[in-house]
Amino acid sequence: MNNMNLNNMNLNNMNLLKEVSEENRLMLLKDYFQTSGLVKHQLETFDHFIFHDIKTIIDDEASIIFNGKRSLSSQIKNGAVEEGYNRKESEKIMLKFENVFVAKPTITNDDTTVRPLYPAEARQKMITYDSFVFVDVLEYVLRDEEEILVNKHLRVQIAKIPIMLRSSTCNLYNCTPQERIELGEGIEDPGGYFIINGNERVLIGQLRNAYNRSICFRNKFSEPLTCDMRSMSEETGHSVLIQLRLNDSPISQKRNLKKLDKNGTIDLIISQTKTPIPISFVFRVLKVATIDKLKFLIGDEEELDKYLIKIVEETSDGGIFDDMEIEISQEDDFNEENEESTEKKKITQFIEQDMFPHLGVSSTHEEKAILLGKMVRKLLLVNETSINANKFAQRANDETNKTNKTNKMYYTQEDRDNYSNKRVETAGVLCFELFRMLYKRFIKSNINQLEKRNRVEMDVISKNAFITTGLHFSFSTGNWGVQKNNYIRTGVAQIPQNKVSFGAFFSYLRRFVIPMGKEGKNTKIRQIHPSSIFFACPSETPEGQFVGITLNFSMLAEVSIRTSSVVIKEIIEASHQAFKHVHEISLEENKQFLSKLSIIFVNGGICGLTSKPQQLLSDVRDLKLKHCLKYDVSAVFIPELKEVHISSDAGRFIRPVLNLQSIKTNGNVMWNSFQNCLENGHVVYKDAYEIEQSQIAINLQDLSRYPTVYDSMEIHASCMLGVMAAQIPFAEHTQSPRLCYQSSMAKQAIGNIPSHHVKSDNTTRVMDYVQRPLVTTQIAEMNRFNDFPNGLNAMVAVAIYTGFNQEDSIILNKASIDRGMFHVVTYKTIIVEERKIGVNEKICMPVASVRRMNNYSLLEDNPESPYFGVVKVKSFVKRNDVLVGKVITKISKDGTRQETDHSTIVSISEEGKVDRIIRTSKKGILMFKIVIAQQKRPEIGDKFCSAMAQKGTVGMILEEVDMPFMEDGSIPDMIINPHCLPSRMTINQIMASIMGKTCCAKNETFGDASPFQESSLEKPQDKIHALCKELEECGYNYNGTETMMCGWNGKKLRAEIFFGPVYYHRLTHMVSDKIFSRASTNQKRHAITRQPLNGRANEGGLRIGEMEKDCMLVHGISKFLHEKMFDQSDKFIINLCVPCKSYFKVVKTQNGFFCSGCNGIDIVKFNCPFAAKLFFQELTAMGQKLEFKVKNA
């Protein structure tokens, strides 16, 4: 019988391994990306804000109440004049908002007609893509505690909210690909961003600590153990920091944890007082003073008795608090009734009313005592674990002594950096918090305005732009918060800078940051935390100061959406049979029964108690399967703390995993439908808290070794990477810094941007001839990154040739460049508009009498043309050519007209061909957008990199006849130095080149180089041998090398050359965009110092600073230094009066110079830099008298 069961078990395991094969899981992954997309976390959270959060904010906020007169339309009720109503008398009026409605974006034409506004037009007109928020205003009269409805004002505008593209409120929602093309949008534009003043803005997620969750930790080894909780109310946003501190003995201050005082006291730390409050006093206020109650709240283990007895003794001592000296901080905010009360009553009021605001206004003493008791229990358990660490370790190693009681008392310190204790605020949550702050001030502003007018007038509300301007300020500046507020976060709304490729924009949309300064010295927070695996990409983070602070979501990572705690509590209460309310528990019941009870927490708030916590977890899973609860609701049981935590708050990291038990039981999985797998329970979402209590297999190798251990499985191991790192071929065959470098450089790789021809960003770079990579990953294919490539497959030879490719230099084939290899076009947009505020500008062809010394021949000179005075399309413009002719007209007091030429001139960085001109208007002001195209051929100094982070700059461009060649005449496109491979250990580039060579030989268009393939996990070296063997079968050398001839003499090269296709990128760092020098004819000077200007924008040169000066002195070229820093800089001649030793009173006359101070003519001249002369004047202005002594005078 046992053998039969074992055989059945083995058979089931084999069937399971067959069911969850890599092929099936990749099929599931493909459907997930097609249905969910990569910006789901942005779109869903914003939709939740629009359809739920705005209504919640308005319902939770107090109504507008003021003394005044009714609106004029409310004087008649039910067709008759209301009895006793006097229109001249003021009444107590209340205005309530309901039926919130957010319209779709619209725009008003010049003839006042309204039509839909689309994103392309918003970009073109440089306006914000936003929509109106309307409410119905109910007007009540408060009389004798009765609310009398006297009027109802429909569709009153209260704000304009920026709308996220492709969200449910966007006009592009549910549009077909063809319709989006007709509306000027790209087919693959994912949305998830905003358009503010014509610029695209992305809200960057903000990582923070979780609210309403206690964390026990020790800051430093010598500091006391603390248990912190930031309690925040869902309704009001009011928060309080509750901190419990275990007072260690003086021995513990010497960093000897094994000798901690076992009778240490516990204090409550709050911001309202600087002096700690004994926990015994807090329990006394909460009417917990007996040992039985404390055992029920904290625990009945013998190890905790000494602490409980001490608390009871202190609680029964009435003078323990009276003898303390309480210092209330200046930030105290108690009401007027308690200002004359004693300090003891103030603390008592805080404990009874303000402590744990997330429990609600109606929370009882019992609920607060339970929550406080659980925090005390956690604190004591961690303390006992620290004291008895060796004993617990010894018991853990001894199988015979491993008892349940030992496990119950073992609880280590918690990690604040653990992702189960973190929340990320995405677009919807950020808008929710900002709108709530603005709405509170909006209500106060309306009350003030209505009281001034002394009447209900809807234009006061509809014309109040407080919310609109506040939202516009935050979105346009990136400073998130209400102006003149202490708490404003910077850099939340950002303009995507690296929009040079398709994948780089997705990376921006999936970014989140830790809001701390880049100069922060905390290195631990920058390190990769084990709990972040499959949530945050371990490779995609910038180098330098922002390392570990700017992060990106992994491929399957999502963010939970808030579900009200009240709804969750009602469902749990109705569905769980062992549920008990707090008030139903009596201490007279069986103590054994009480010891089995576990507290149910919903988002940190107390829901009830249960004697069957495991059954509750099962009930929650069934409710999720029946769609009674959302898929992102999580439930975990912590036996050491006797707590069940059900989480439905927003911002939790969640991801889908395979439910092995469901797959075993049901089978017949539809792997091509992610939604079907989710509905049938084959796929479940888990957050970081649930994952800590789960056994998840990463691949089939883990599952086959321990099939009975794992309850879940990852969909694919490569999903631990982010958008950019997941595109790197064979990412597991290179060192981790290379993945980080490539994730950053791939964002700078110039590619083909969707719909770039209809957008007019400030600078857009597009590669002319892009190619799909021969070797790529499954994730890149599934998300269609290869449909918009950012490089090409170059034939690369790895060899030392001429010496010009040393130190990461690259030799390029000139003939390949002539055929279009790596050609890039840079589009620069110049915006010119007619200014009407303060000046009177007009775009036209300036008359000859007012023109400057510029070229006006390229302008349209037909007055009937709508482009009169604007440069013609397809014209080649260069420096000092006029792009747009503009004239400023001023009328003097005597009536004469004076015209001044104010035309827009081409600068040195804007030379090129006029690609297109867009004529539009913004708020009635004429505007032209001129797009100039610049052709960028590869040249010496330009930067390139492979898809495996082998970067380099062009060191030489060789003629094709000088390049090495093979026997069949094949010539490489580029030559790289072989020393770059062993030093950087980029084995994946060698593998990708071999696979690409095989693909070319077999006429295959796709070589699968996905990381962590099942076939290469057991023995990675077998994968390399298999690639080489396959190449050999195609007729090439096993190791990928080729015999090549020298390009100069045709002789055979001694060494065989590794030769094959490698996917290469051209980066945005180009010499033509950075090189600059100052012309000798440039006479531009600084207005104050009279020194030449430096910098490319000022047409200046490199500034000679202090260090440059020292280097030139070392080289012995002091004459050159004198010439550059004096003769050609700010040379100045000073006339000095020798007797007065000053030059301030020397004046020039017809007969020469004389001193007006002493009437003398003993004047000498000396050379001096004008900056020094300016310094002398500043010293004189500060009251310092300067005297100049002349030698031999």
UniProtKB/Swiss-Prot annotation:
Keywords: DNA-directed RNA polymerase, Magnesium, Metal-binding, Nucleotidyltransferase, Transcription, Transferase, Zinc, Zinc-finger. GO terms for molecular function: DNA binding; DNA-directed RNA polymerase activity; ribonucleoside binding; zinc ion binding. The keyword Transcription applies. Zn(2+) binds at residues 1137, 1140, 1155, 1158. GO terms for cellular component: DNA-directed RNA polymerase complex. Its EC number is 2.7.7.6. A zinc finger (C4-type) spans 1137-1158. It catalyses: RNA(n) + a ribonucleoside 5'-triphosphate = RNA(n+1) + diphosphate. Mg(2+) binds at residue 808. The keyword Secreted does not apply. InterPro entries: DNA-dir_RNA_pol_su2, DNA-dir_RNAP_su2_dom, DNA-dir_RNAP_su2_hyb_sf, RNA_pol_bsu_protrusion, RNA_pol_Rpb2_2_sf, RNA_pol_Rpb2_3, RNA_pol_Rpb2_4, RNA_pol_Rpb2_7. Signal peptide: none annotated. Belongs to the RNA polymerase beta chain family. PANTHER family: DNA-DIRECTED RNA POLYMERASE I SUBUNIT 2. Component of the DNA-dependent RNA polymerase that catalyzes the transcription of DNA into RNA using the four ribonucleoside triphosphates as substrates. Second largest component of RNA polymerase II which synthesizes mRNA precursors and many functional non-coding RNAs. Proposed to contribute to the polymerase catalytic activity and forms the polymerase active center together with the largest subunit. This is Probable DNA-directed RNA polymerase II subunit RPB2 homolog.
